[in-house]
């Protein structure tokens, strides 16, 4: 059963990851005080997965400007991750990575986050936004054939950061600089009168 619930502490983990071409033990608690985007993908050496991982890695600078750490995870071993990173992109590999890739080869992290496809031993495409206090703020899970949007993930992080800082809420499709809503029956009318 999933331990991952919105508004509750994100399940803690410690695992081996490939970081800057080397093996390193990392824990979720290492990132306390920062927003974290944790995303799971099904398998190394597949087809949709490299498009997502490369996209998140190439946009990591935008996340870092927002104080956000990005972590990828699958049930493959750290050795498989490293081999995939060392495979050129033109051959379906990842090439240089700017984000840690976690090995969940005992499936515990995927199980705790509710994304383990038990019959195949792989993770669904789960994406989790965790705030600086370690609280889960957002969960999405895609079926295997459809990748996720880095742009939408950035937008969601920015929306949660705005809410945390200003106490106002963000309407559908909100982007930085757009109008927000003051929560309250009377206060919200100012937004609705404009829109």
UniProtKB/Swiss-Prot annotation:
Its EC number is 1.11.1.24. It catalyses: a hydroperoxide + [thioredoxin]-dithiol = an alcohol + [thioredoxin]-disulfide + H2O. One of its GO terms (biological process) is response to oxidative stress. The active site is at residue 49. It is an enzyme of class 1 (oxidoreductase). Residues 4-162 form the Thioredoxin domain. GO terms for cellular component: cytosol. GO terms for molecular function: antioxidant activity; peroxidase activity; thioredoxin peroxidase activity. Keywords: Antioxidant, Disulfide bond, Oxidoreductase, Peroxidase, Redox-active center. The active site is a conserved redox-active cysteine residue, the peroxidatic cysteine (C(P)), which makes the nucleophilic attack on the peroxide substrate. The peroxide oxidizes the C(P)-SH to cysteine sulfenic acid (C(P)-SOH), which then reacts with another cysteine residue, the resolving cysteine (C(R)), to form a disulfide bridge. The disulfide is subsequently reduced by an appropriate electron donor to complete the catalytic cycle. In this typical 2-Cys peroxiredoxin, C(R) is provided by the other dimeric subunit to form an intersubunit disulfide. Belongs to the peroxiredoxin family. AhpC/Prx1 subfamily. Thiol-specific peroxidase that catalyzes the reduction of hydrogen peroxide and organic hydroperoxides to water and alcohols, respectively. Plays a role in cell protection against oxidative stress by detoxifying peroxides and as sensor of hydrogen peroxide-mediated signaling events. Homodimer; disulfide-linked, upon oxidation. This is Peroxiredoxin. It comes from Ascaris suum (Pig roundworm).
């Amino acid at each position: 059963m999933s331990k991952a619930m919105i508004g509750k502490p994100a399940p803690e983990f410690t695992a081996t990851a490939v970081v800057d071409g080397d093996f390193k033990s990392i824990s979720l608690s290492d990132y306390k005080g920062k927003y974290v985007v944790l995303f799971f993908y099904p398998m190394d050496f597949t087809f949709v997965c490299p498009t997502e991982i490369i996209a998140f890695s190439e946009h990591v600078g935008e996340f870092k400007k927002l104080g956000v750490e990005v972590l990828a995870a699958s049930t493959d071993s750290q050795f498989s991750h490293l081999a995939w990173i060392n495979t050129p992109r033109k051959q379906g590999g990842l090439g240089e990575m700017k984000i840690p890739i976690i090995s969940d080869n005992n499936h515990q992290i995927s199980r705790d986050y509710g994304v383990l496809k038990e019959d195949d031993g792989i993770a669904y495409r789960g994406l989790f936004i965790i705030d600086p206090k370690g609280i889960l703020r957002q969960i999405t899970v895609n079926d295997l054939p459809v990748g996720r949007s880095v742009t939408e993930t950035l937008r969601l992080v920015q929306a949660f950061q705005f809410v945390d800082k200003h106490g106002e809420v963000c309407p559908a499709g909100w982007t930085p600089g757009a109008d927000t809503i003051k929560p309250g029956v009377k206060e919200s009318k100012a937004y609705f009168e404009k829109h």
